[in-house]
Every structure is written in structure tokens, then in C-alpha cells.
Amino acid sequence: ISSAASDVYKRQAYVVADYCGGLLSPQAESCQERVRIFMENLNLHLQQQGYLDTVLYDPSGFDMEALTTTLDLKEVVYRLLEYSWFREIVSQNTYTATLPDGSTQIWQNTNAFLDPTSEYYNENVCGIKTGSLSDDYNLIVLYQQHGKEFLICSLGSQSDSSRYDDVNFILKTIDESYYLTQ
């Protein structure tokens, strides 16, 4: 995401949080109060859904104080993988969404494992997500091999390329596993 696109995304997230906070608490008078109410309710919802180690502070997701665990990430991804529309979207290098007004929005997946022109392209990777904040580079990969699916959560790699190298090491181990071929 470019800096300008990131700023637009952040503003949109705050507009949605402000609106939802107003629905949750019509008496809230300021945008700041409505966003706070939204975030409190979002965190309560996460707890009720069983994501006990996740706390979010910024509706945009650009939050250096947010906390989560690989266990919570795994649970979220497993729930989402139950939906074919989710699998379809995250498995593509680019995805074109048709919006309610009939216009289209093209999303570029930043997962280099899905890009046929990338040195990291791997036809057995079924997608999911990249992410980075500050100097932490993260990657969640769904991998199919030996008739099985593997969910790999790699957090805190040192660079964009090292996150792919880190996961490639795991993929190679899966590919070469005698145990998994039995």
C-alpha cells in the first residue's frame, strides 16, 4: 500500500468506526468517543468469539500497540477458510470486486507466492495474507501438499524477502517429509 492509499484507508476505517460507534451509542457526542466505543465493543466481540489474546486499539489496523498470537490468527483463518468466497479472494494475485454501485475495485495481493512473475511463486500456495508494521514482516500462507493443507504463520521476519525465505524453508521441509507422504 502506498502512503497516500494508506492514508485513505485509515480515514475510511475511522469513518466506519465513527458510524458504528454512533449506532452502538447514539448519545456519544464526539467522533473520538464514538471510535472509542466502537473499539471497546470490537474487543469485547473478539473476546466473546474466543480470541482471548487479541487486543486492537486502532480501527485502521495500523497499530503498533495491538496484540495477538499465532493461535488467535490460526483460529480466525480457520473460520474464514470455511467460506469459499474467502478462499477464492485470497488465492488470487489480483481480485476484481464489483461494488454495490456497479463500479469495480481491483485489489492486488502482496503475497509474492501467488505472483507468477515472482521468484517466490509457488503453485501449491493457496494464498492468505502478508502484513508489516515498522520492521516486522509477517506472512500467513495456506499450502497444499501430499493431499493435505498446512497453515503457516510467520511473524517478525527481518525484511520483505526474508519472510518468503523463512516460509520457503518450512515449505521445503513439508515437500521433503517422508512422514507426510505415508
How does the language model describe each region?
Residues 18-182:
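Penicillin-recognizing serine hydrolase domain
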Residues 1-5, 9:
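Single conserved hydrophobic/aromatic residue that forms the stacking wall/gate
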